[in-house]
Amino acid sequence: MSCPNNSGNFLMDPLMGGSSSFRDEGYSSNSGMYIHTAAECGYSVMKVEPSPLSKSRDVPAGSVLLSSFQDAPYLSAQPSTWTPGTKSSRDQQLVAQCLQPCSFPAGNVKEEAFCCFYQDGSKRKQTTESATYIRLRDNRCGPEQTTTQARGCFQMYNREEPQQDDQLFAPACSLLHLGTSVESQSKISCSKFATETGKDERKEEKARSDGCSETSDNEELKGRNLQSQRTLFLCLNVSAILLRNSRVLVFGNSHDASSEKTTGNWLKAKSGRKKRCPYTKHQTLELEKEFLFNMYLSRERRLEISRSINLTDRQVKIWFQNRRMKLKKLNRESREREQGVVYNYC
């Protein structure tokens, strides 16, 4: 019979008859392993585990070395009920397809340190299916399969009948490698974490957009308030300036008119009319100084003064004539006042 290219598959039909593990009969010739007896465990469940002799040289009295049973078959005709040391293997079972049995000498198979679990042999007569030895591949091929978290362990159960708490294993069974489901759990946790992070990022983006919109609205409102305040302030300033100007125009003009009527101004006469030939202060000052120094000007001096104060020769000549006439008028008025005072005393 052909066998697939797998070092872990071998024929177990010739090995099913023989010794029993309950009677302390070993499996193969391996000086590095020994089997604990049922009397040592204290219950009907028997646990097989690798124990190097280099680390445990003192072998217990109830244990039997595998090296003492070189010609014993590998498995017994009626396997006892073996259960794993942890409760997780009772709850989580791995279901897989049985491979076709292959025939090659079992002596060429390399011994490995693993645990084998068997079911009660009372129900072995119910079925005639052949038991195969299967080592499963990694969990990444079947993420939907759940496995126990125990490496190097093998569990035997029936592929046709469902497992119960009281009936753990079937007689026609498969040896399956129990791996860990860390990768599937990590994938699920990573997907959950990615979805949660995506939701958090979306919430943060929404909050930021809402905050930005609120800040922009607040800035717009502040800008509008500032503009309205500025316009109101400008309107108040303009109204205040207009009120001041109106007051100055109303009250100031009347005050100026009354004062000009009594005293007069250098631009206006006593009557309030505007003078016909107004001069600037600088021009009148220069002409007054020159008139006090000399009431009559020569032609050369008149030209010099007109050039210095930016006036024409004729304007300077007319101003001097008017000033002399004014001086004569003032002298005559003063003389008349003096004569009137003298006459009053008489």
Swiss-Prot record:
- Protein's UniProt keywords contain Translocase: no
Please state the protein's primary subcellular location. nucleus
**PROSITE patterns, sorted:** HOMEOBOX_1, HOMEOBOX_2
| Disulphide-bonded residues | none
Print the keywords alphabetically: Developmental protein, DNA-binding, Homeobox, Nucleus, Transcription, Transcription regulation
Report the protein's function: Sequence-specific transcription factor which is part of a developmental regulatory system that provides cells with specific positional identities on the anterior-posterior axis.
Q: What protein am I looking at?
A: Homeobox protein Hox-C10a
Organism per entry: Takifugu rubripes
